[in-house]
Amino acid sequence: MPALSGPQYLGEGLKLIMRPGLRLFVLIPLTLNLLVFALLIGFAMQQFSHWVDLLMPSLPDWLSFLQYIVWPLFVLLVLVIVFFTFTMVANIISAPFNGFLSEKVEVVVRGRDDFPPFSWAELLAMIPRTMGREMRKLAYFLPRALVLLVLSFVPGVNLIATPLWILFGIWMMAVQYIDYPADNHKLGWNEMLAWLRSKRWACMGFGGVTYLALLIPLVNLVMMPAAVAGATLFWVREEGEKALVK
């Protein structure tokens, strides 16, 4: 199968989740994500101005005109942090369903079924493994995010925090979603990261378009399962199974 560009993988993923046989595996995580989104956005709307004021540096009177220039950067920074939080929480909650969705997408793409049939018992059995994998992602994400968060409070340096958050976010989108098919095939965490680095530009292309799509409220709810499907197609087309051969 020929490789695609990053945007094409997400677009094809969106088409795949519309197939009748995959809708059940989309509907459950979609409902969970909707609940998480409603709760988080409600809280963020109440605290938004406070968070922006907290991050904004204090400027002397003679530089007060710069406030109108840097303020949009800090608004964007808060939006990026809220986005990260929603994505992280939603993916932890939906992880077992996303793993099953990835399996079923791979069956459709390859035209053969190498996975156990769906059952609620099988889903429950997946929870410890998928939760463990999500905790591994969290352990990868949090130290790096903490460094960026500290930079966000350092005057002067915090001006570059927003673009660094965005670049990190793009990479994390590739890690987050391509890990589902990798984990289904029992590819180790470090091996998965090494494989992604070997496909760095393709991963950044997929991660970039996914990042942009997930920034759009409500649209992001549909794009999360589309990203799972697109990442699974990425795994198949970019020959991820070769990473399993040592």
Curated annotation (Swiss-Prot):
Please give the chief subcellular localization of this protein. membrane
User: What GO cellular component is one of the record's annotations?
Assistant: plasma membrane
The record's listing under NCBIfam families reads: PRK04949.1 (NF003433)
Q: What role does it play?
A: High affinity, high specificity proton-dependent sulfate transporter, which mediates sulfate uptake. Provides the sulfur source for the cysteine synthesis pathway.
Task: Please list the GO biological process terms of this entry.
Answer: cysteine biosynthetic process; sulfate assimilation
Taxonomic superkingdom: Bacteria
TM spans (from-to): 24-44, 69-89, 148-168, 214-234
Q: Extract the InterPro entries matched here.
A: CysZ_sulfate_transptr, Sulfate_CysZ
- What are the alphabetically sorted keywords of the record? Amino-acid biosynthesis, Cell inner membrane, Cell membrane, Cysteine biosynthesis, Membrane, Sulfate transport, Transmembrane, Transmembrane helix, Transport
What is the organism of origin for this protein? Pseudomonas aeruginosa (strain LESB58)
What HAMAP family does the annotation carry?
CysZ (MF_00468)
One of the entry's Gene Ontology molecular-function terms is: high-affinity sulfate:proton symporter activity
Report membrane topology.
Multi-pass membrane protein
Q: Which Pfam families match?
A: EI24
Protein family according to the UniProt entry: Belongs to the CysZ family.
Protein name from the UniProt record = Sulfate transporter CysZ
Where is the protein found, in the record's own terms?
Answer: Cell inner membrane
